[in-house]
Each structure stands twice: as structure tokens, then as C-alpha cells.
């Protein structure tokens, strides 16, 4: 018999679906259930790499970690990676499928329904419970005919479905009741409960709100989840970095350039969680004032990002910048002398002069490198421990002359290798590499921060697992009885 499915849908994007699924995965795993997350289709440039080299959304990989299992492509069989100019690379079952304009994908997406059901069925045959996540709103009426991620999944799996609204953005009654009103009757009958998320203050003050929602909908409110600060889990959408933070008077501030089609910006979450470190996202050269370091992040379209940097006036600003300059993946490519795309891998192709801050050149090829990777640092402050991360890139970068490498790669997937990666300037101020997840490695992160003059204000070890913190928070809001019924441990 296929495993039951619990599904979390939301009234809009960024209402907390991903974090709630992560919490439920951890809470189910604590009860001894073999549980897996599932999201049929995701749109994000924040990608993770599975053990077999497939790509899935990082938010799904976090949910798998919450469940205590390794992520697989079955958990997120369709990943849309926007490239700009209304085009996206479509990843199907972990591998590049096609690069399509929005209209072309819309016309073809219903063909992918079989991919969705095949992978969901495989998870249901393997695990005791699957916790699925929707995307955006399930009642975008102009898009509903092509739905392969929201209520079509719920109906197919006959899922116990939860509807989540975000009270912090206001209009919680319109959010929840309006969504219910627009669902088809066969869809509405699957809704087992409502969740009011991100309540600031005492939830007891919303007792009347709970009563109104239950009276008008006939559906129980399973919990009012209070706002939780500084959770530190990977964000799915770039909307999470739209609000910048000021340069702090104490500690150090690191600027990350908010490039168009920025990718894998959760690379910098470990830096932001350190005491005495502020990470701010910038898009103007004037915002470099007072920061200790600037990071050029990964990006989905490197040549377009290069032109954007030039148009914004970053070329001269970065050349004059006295602090540390770092590039990760696409950012590493941008730091070099030249970027070439003779096969139009990124769309229109072309050839661009880089920022010229590192003696490297990049050429794009049609084969995508997607691996879980282990490396050693070749710099004294990088520590002795192996560095664990992942690679996702279609560029091949080589150093010019006697330039020094930053890392030695010793393993890709299950294969032992011995290959240099990255580059560092003679004075150590400018460096870059392809390894995402570099700053999750404590020795490397702390070593680099100390190079910037960082002095931790509290202990840098023994932090609480953010997933456990989140799970405890959600468990308090929903209660053990609700959770047991949801997971079908009791009826």
C-alpha cells in the first residue's frame, strides 16, 4: 500500500511552506517514521547536488536533512532555474532538459506530469510518509489548468492537506478564506486544517481570529505559529535578500553583490550567523564604503552579470576597493581576465573582458559539472580539515602563468581525484573558486574571517541545530495530538 501523503500549500509565495515542511519532516522522523519530502516543481537558482550528481532545490535538500536522509532527485523532479530575459533552464530528474522561454515551458509542462507522478509513487513505495510542498498559491486561476505542483498533486495522492497563511504580511482572513473559496469542491474537501504562520506577539491575542476562521470555513485552525528570529535555513527565493542591512559600528561587515539571477546565495548564511559579522546585499558601488570584504556570488548568467557590473560602475569601484574580494562559482569567473561562450551555452553567447582581478580565463562548455566535492585548502589560514561542498557550473576556468590555486580537489562524488581549483592573488586579498558550501566548513570560515580582523564576541562552537529549533517551535504551536493525527499515528 502506498505511503500516505501530507501536503502543505500556501496562500502565496514565501508564507513559510518550506520551513514548515522541514519542521514536519523532523517531527515525523523523531517519531520513528521513515519520511521523505517532495516538491513536484521548484523555481529557484539555489540548487543542491545529490550524491549521483543531480540538481534539486536547496530547500528540498534541507528538508531531506531534516528527515535524516540523503536528498535524491525524486524529491524535486522538476527544477526551473531562471536565466533572465524570460528564459529558464529546466532540470528534469536532476539533469538539464531544455532551456525554454516562459511561454514554451507553459505549453510543455503538462507533458511533465508523468515525471511528477512517477517520482512521487517511488517515494511512497520506499518511505512510511511523504510530506509534499506546493508552490506559490494554488488558486492562480489563469495558471491552474497547467498545475503540476499544487492541488493536482494533492488530489492524485489524496493528501491530508494543510493551508498556510502569513499573518505578518496582513490580510490573513482574505488569504485563507479567499483561497478556500476559489478551490474546487473536490480540492477543498482535502484541506484538513489551517495554519496561521509568523504571528508576532502572544498567540492568545488571536483567539477571536481563530474562532472567525473556523466558523467561516468549517475547517479547524491547527495552530498559530509565532514569528521565529534568525532561523538560518536556506531560503528558496531571492526575495529573502531584497532588504539590505546597514554597516555595523562594531564587528565586521561583508557585502555580497546582489547580481541579477543570483544563485546559491545561501553560501553566505554561515557567515551571517557568526557573532560580530553582518552580511549585507548591495547593488550600488557606493554601498562598499565601510565593509571589510566584498563577495561576488554565483549567478545563472555570467556574461549578463559582467555587463551589469560594468553598467552599474562596479569595475572601478572594485579595483579601488582596499578590502578582501572573493568570487564563488560565477563570481570567480567574473574576477578573471576573460569569459568566453562560443557555443552560446548561456543563450546569446559572446566574449567579455572580466574584471581582471585574478589571472584566470573561463570558457563555457555544454557539459555541466554537478558533483558533491571534497577539497583541501592550499592557504595557511584555511585549516587542515577536508572542505566539503558541491560544484554546479558549465564554465571551465584555467589559471594563467604561475598563478596560485586556492584549493586541491581530492574527491568528486565517489571518485578520488587530484585537481587544483580556484586562484588567489599573491597578497591573498583576492581569491575565488568553484566550490559552493565553502563557508559551511568551520576552520576555513573562521580562518578567513580572522584575516579580516574578526574577533568573535561569543563562543563559535556548540550552536543549536536550527532544524531542531524550528521543529520544537512548530511542535509547541501545533501540539503533539495534532501531529500524531496528521502523521496517522492516531485517528
Swiss-Prot record:
Transport: present as a keyword of the record? Answer: no
In what residue span(s) does the GATase cobBQ-type domain sit? Answer: 251-444
* One Pfam family linked to the record: CbiA
* GO terms classed as biological process: cobalamin biosynthetic process
Which positions are catalytic residues? 329, 436
Which top-rank group of organisms is this from? Bacteria
Question: Keyword annotations for this protein?
Answer: Cobalamin biosynthesis, Glutamine amidotransferase
User: What pathway, per the record?
Assistant: Cofactor biosynthesis; adenosylcobalamin biosynthesis
Gene Ontology MF annotations: ABC-type vitamin B12 transporter activity; catalytic activity
Q: Which PROSITE patterns match?
A: GATASE_COBBQ
Role, per record: Catalyzes amidations at positions B, D, E, and G on adenosylcobyrinic A,C-diamide. NH(2) groups are provided by glutamine, and one molecule of ATP is hydrogenolyzed for each amidation.
> Which family does the UniProt entry place this protein in?
Belongs to the CobB/CobQ family. CobQ subfamily.
What is the recorded name of this protein? Cobyric acid synthase
Q: What does UniProt list as this organism's lineage?
A: Bacteria, Bacillati, Chloroflexota, Chloroflexia, Chloroflexales
Amino acid at each position: 500500500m502506498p505511503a500516505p501523503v501530507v501536503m502543505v500549500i500556501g496562500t502565496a509565495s514565501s508564507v513559510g511552506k518550506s520551513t514548515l515542511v522541514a519542521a514536519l519532516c523532523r517531527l515525523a522522523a523523531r517519531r520513528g517514521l521513515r519520511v521523505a519530502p517532495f516538491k513536484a516543481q521548484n523555481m529557484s537558482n539555489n540548487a543542491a547536488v545529490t550524491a549521483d550528481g543531480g540538481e534539486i532545490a536547496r530547500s528540498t535538500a534541507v528538508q531531506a536533512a531534516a528527515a535524516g536522509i540523503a536528498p535524491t532527485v525524486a524529491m524535486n523532479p522538476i527544477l526551473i532555474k531562471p536565466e533572465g530575459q524570460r528564459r529558464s533552464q529546466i532540470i528534469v530528474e536532476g539533469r538539464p532538459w531544455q532551456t525554454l522561454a516562459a511561454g514554451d515551458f507553459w505549453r510543455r509542462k503538462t507533458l511533465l506530469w508523468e515525471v511528477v507522478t512517477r517520482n512521487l509513487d517511488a517515494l511512497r513505495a520506499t518511505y512510511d510518509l511523504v510530506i509534499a510542498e506546493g508552490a506559490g498559491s494554488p488558486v492562480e486561476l489563469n495558471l491552474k489548468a497547467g498545475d503540476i505542483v499544487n492541488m493536482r498533486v494533492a488530489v492524485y495522492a489524496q493528501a491530508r492537506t494543510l493551508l498556510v497563511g502569513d499573518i505578518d504580511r496582513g490580510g490573513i482572513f482574505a488569504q485563507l478564506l479567499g483561497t478556500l473559496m476559489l478551490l474546487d469542491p473536490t480540492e477543498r474537501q482535502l484541506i484538513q486544517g489551517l495554519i496561521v504562520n509568523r504571528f508576532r506577539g502572544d498567540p492568545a491575542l488571536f483567539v477571536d481570529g481563530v474562532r472567525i476562521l473556523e466558523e467561516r470555513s468549517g475547517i479547524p485552525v491547527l495552530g498559530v505559529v509565532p514569528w521565529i528570529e534568525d532561523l538560518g535555513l536556506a531560503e528558496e527565493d531571492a526575495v529573502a535578500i531584497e532588504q539590505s542591512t546597514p554597516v555595523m559600528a562594531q564587528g565586521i561587515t561583508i557585502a555580497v553583490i546582489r547580481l541579477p539571477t543570483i544563485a546559491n546565495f545561501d553560501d553566505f548564511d554561515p557567515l551571517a550567523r557568526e557573532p560580530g559579522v553582518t552580511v549585507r546585499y548591495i547593488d550600488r558601488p557606493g554601498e562598499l564604503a565601510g565593509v571589510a570584504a566584498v563577495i561576488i556570488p554565483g549567478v545563472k548568467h555570467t556574461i549578463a552579470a559582467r555587463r551589469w557590473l560594468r553598467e552599474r560602475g562596479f569595475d572601478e569601484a572594485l579595483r579601488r576597493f582596499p578590502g578582501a574580494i572573493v568570487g564563488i562559482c560565477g563570481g570567480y569567473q567574473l574576477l578573471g581576465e576573460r569569459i568566453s561562450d562560443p557555443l552560446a551555452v548561456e543563450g546569446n553567447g559572446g566574449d567579455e573582458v572580466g574584471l581582471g582581478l585574478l589571472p584566470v580565463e573561463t570558457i563555457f562548455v555544454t557539459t555541466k559539472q554537478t558533483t558533491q566535492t571534497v577539497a583541501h585548502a592550499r592557504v595557511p589560514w584555511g585549516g587542515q580539515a577536508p572542505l566539503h561542498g558541491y560544484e554546479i557550473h558549465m564554465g571551465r576556468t584555467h589559471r594563467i602563468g604561475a598563478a596560485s590555486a586556492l584549493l586541491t580537489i581530492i574527491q568528486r562524488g565517489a571518485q578520488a581525484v587530484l585537481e587544483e581549483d580556484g586562484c588567489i592573488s599573491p597578497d591573498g586579498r583576492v581569491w575565488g573558486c568553484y566550490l559552493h558550501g565553502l563557508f559551511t566548513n568551520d576552520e576555513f570560515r573562521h580562518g578567513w574571517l580572522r584575516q579580516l580582523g574578526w574577533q568573535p564576541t561569543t563562543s563559535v562552537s556548540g550552536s543549536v541545530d536550527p532544524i531542531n529549533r524550528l521543529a520544537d517551535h512548530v511542535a509547541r504551536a501545533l501540539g503533539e495530538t495534532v501531529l500524531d493525527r496528521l502523521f496517522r499515528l492516531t485517528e
